[in-house]
C-alpha cells in the first residue's frame, strides 16, 4: 500500500471531526457576533469586590440552530436580519449601567444577561417578526454566549 503524503494524513483527520455545534436534533446552525460594554454591581457578600460598580466588555455570540433550512432561501435565518436584530437588542444594554436598566437588586451576572438577550431575540424572531410580516416564525434553538474574556464565558440555550 502506498504511503500518503503527510498533508493528506493531516487533512483526513480534520475531515472526520464533526461540527462542534451540530446535533442530531438541530444539524444546521448560523452564528453571529457583536459586543457590548456595560457597568453593573452585584448584591451579596458572595460577590466580594464585585459589589462595587465595575465595568465589563462582552463579546456576544449568538447561534441559531434548526432542523432544516428555510425552503427556497437555503438558510437557517437571514444573517443580515439576525445581525441587525442583535444590534438593536444590544443597544438597550450597551454603554449602560445595568443597575439602572433592571429592577433594583437584580444581579446582572453573565448568565443572567445571556438569558435576557435570549428572551429578546426569541421575542423578535418568534413573535414580533411574524406579526409585522417580516418573515416566518423561527423554529429551532437559539444559543447566546457572552464572553467575559478569553478565559471565561456563560451560555443560555433554549428551543423557541
Question: Which positions does each model-derived feature cover?
Answer:
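Charge-rich, low-complexity N-terminal segments
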Residues: 8-160
Amino acid at each position: 500500500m502506498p504511503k500518503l503524503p503527510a498533508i493528506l494524513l493531516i487533512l483526513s483527520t480534520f475531515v472526520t471531526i464533526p461540527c462542534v455545534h451540530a446535533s442530531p436534533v438541530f444539524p444546521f446552525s448560523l452564528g453571529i457576533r457583536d459586543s457590548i460594554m456595560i457597568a453593573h454591581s452585584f448584591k451579596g457578600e458572595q460577590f466580594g469586590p464585585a459589589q462595587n460598580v465595575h465595568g465589563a466588555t462582552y463579546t456576544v455570540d449568538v447561534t441559531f440552530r434548526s432542523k432544516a433550512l428555510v425552503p427556497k432561501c437555503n438558510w437557517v435565518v437571514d444573517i443580515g436580519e439576525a445581525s441587525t436584530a442583535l444590534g438593536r437588542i444590544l443597544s438597550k444594554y450597551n454603554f449602560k449601567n445595568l443597575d439602572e436598566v433592571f429592577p433594583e437588586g437584580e444581579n446582572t451576572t453573565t448568565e443572567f444577561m445571556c438569558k435576557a438577550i435570549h428572551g429578546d431575540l426569541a421575542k423578535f424572531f418568534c413573535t414580533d417578526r411574524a406579526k409585522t410580516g417580516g418573515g416566518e416564525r423561527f423554529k429551532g434553538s437559539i444559543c447566546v454566549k457572552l464572553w467575559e474574556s478569553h478565559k471565561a464565558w456563560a451560555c443560555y440555550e433554549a428551543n423557541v
